[in-house]
């Protein structure tokens, strides 16, 4: 009797900590009623609250950066030789990267959009891979491939060509991580063009070059422009792959992100000033992009 009574007491205590199914359903129905009432009274707040949280997450760090960077030495840092060299190198290498992406990426994007061949999906996967790779992995891969003792770099070194820790290495690292953005955007732009337009151009006697230059290129212009600007901005902010493959040599491989990293270790004021300069350049570029897109739509 003692064991049986203890079991009854145990199960009775355990059952007290649990709500019966009817009580649980009652709580859920009350919660649903509250949600419905909240939606009826303030239906927009369901969208405003999470949106405001995310916008605050975007705005507050930039605001804090601007506030902390404003001091008496701001213009001295912004007009310093280090800032000028880093900005000039960033603009030059990013522009070269964008040009290489357009020149070599446009034909590749057109092939992927219009041609049908084996292993096409694998090639698309290979092109998109640098977009999702961690920058450190990209830099290490470039160093293993094109370093002096790398798989292909050792062969280049026999001909007197050494890529690591040069300006060419900066451009190569930027192309590796940024050019896939252009190829992806251009491929989507070419894919969205109606194939009947190509057939009509063929009927009118247009050759392959005329078809591409006079039909495909103008119709995909918005996607090509968007991809080019994405490539430029991604190259401008490239850090991880560049520091592993090209290093951080002032005037040679020290782009703006490199100078910010070095300034963070030595002088926070320089890092803050260079960060603001990069933010201003990025904002100007985004405004230019919006204006070009608006003209294209008009």
Predicted regions and their residues:
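Periplasmic/extracellular loop-to-transmembrane helix junction in inner-membrane transport proteins
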Residues: 31-45, 64-99, 111-120, 262-268
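Transmembrane-helix boundary motif in ABC transporter permease subunits
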Residues: 38, 75-77, 96-127, 140, ...
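Transmembrane alpha-helices and adjacent helix-loop boundaries
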Residues: 133-139
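Transmembrane alpha-helices
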Residues: 49-53, 129, 176-190, 194, ...
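Membrane-interfacial helix termini and adjacent extracytoplasmic/periplasmic loops
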Residues: 30-37, 84, 139-175, 246-249
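Interhelical loop and adjacent transmembrane-helix boundary motif
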Residues: 33-34, 38-43, 75, 81, ...
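Transmembrane alpha-helical segments of polytopic membrane transport and secretion proteins
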Residues: 2-50, 117, 288-298
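Short hydrophobic faces within alpha-helices
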Residues: 129, 196-204, 271
């Amino acid at each position: 009797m003692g064991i049986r009574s203890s079991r009854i007491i145990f199960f009775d205590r355990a059952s007290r900590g649990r709500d019966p199914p009817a009580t649980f359903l009652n709580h859920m129905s009350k919660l649903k009623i509250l949600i419905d009432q909240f939606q009826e009274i303030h239906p927009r707040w369901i969208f405003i609250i999470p949106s405001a949280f995310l916008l605050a997450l975007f705005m507050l760090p930039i605001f804090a950066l601007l506030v902390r960077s404003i001091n008496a030495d701001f213009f001295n840092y912004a007009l310093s030789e280090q800032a000028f060299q880093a900005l000039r190198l960033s603009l030059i290498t990013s522009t070269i990267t964008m040009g290489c992406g357009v020149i070599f990426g446009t034909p590749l994007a057109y092939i992927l959009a219009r041609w049908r061949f084996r292993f096409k999906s694998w090639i698309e996967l290979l092109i998109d891979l640098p977009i999702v790779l961690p920058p450190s992995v990209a830099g290490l891969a470039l160093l293993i491939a094109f370093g002096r003792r790398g798989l292909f770099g050792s062969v280049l070194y026999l001909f007197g060509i050494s890529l690591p820790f040069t300006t060419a290495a900066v451009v190569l690292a930027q192309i590796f991580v940024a050019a896939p953005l252009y190829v992806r955007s251009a491929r989507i732009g070419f894919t969205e063009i109606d194939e009947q337009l190509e057939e009509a151009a063929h009927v009118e006697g247009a050759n392959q070059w005329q078809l591409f230059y006079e039909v495909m290129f103008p119709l995909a212009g918005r996607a090509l422009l968007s991809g080019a600007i994405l490539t430029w901005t991604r190259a401008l902010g490239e850090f991880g792959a560049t520091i592993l493959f090209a290093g951080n040599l002032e005037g040679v491989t020290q782009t703006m992100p490199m100078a910010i990293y070095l300034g963070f270790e030595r002088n926070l004021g320089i890092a803050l000033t260079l960060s603001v300069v990069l933010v201003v350049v990025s904002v100007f570029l985004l405004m230019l992009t919006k204006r070009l897109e608006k003209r294209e739509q008009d």
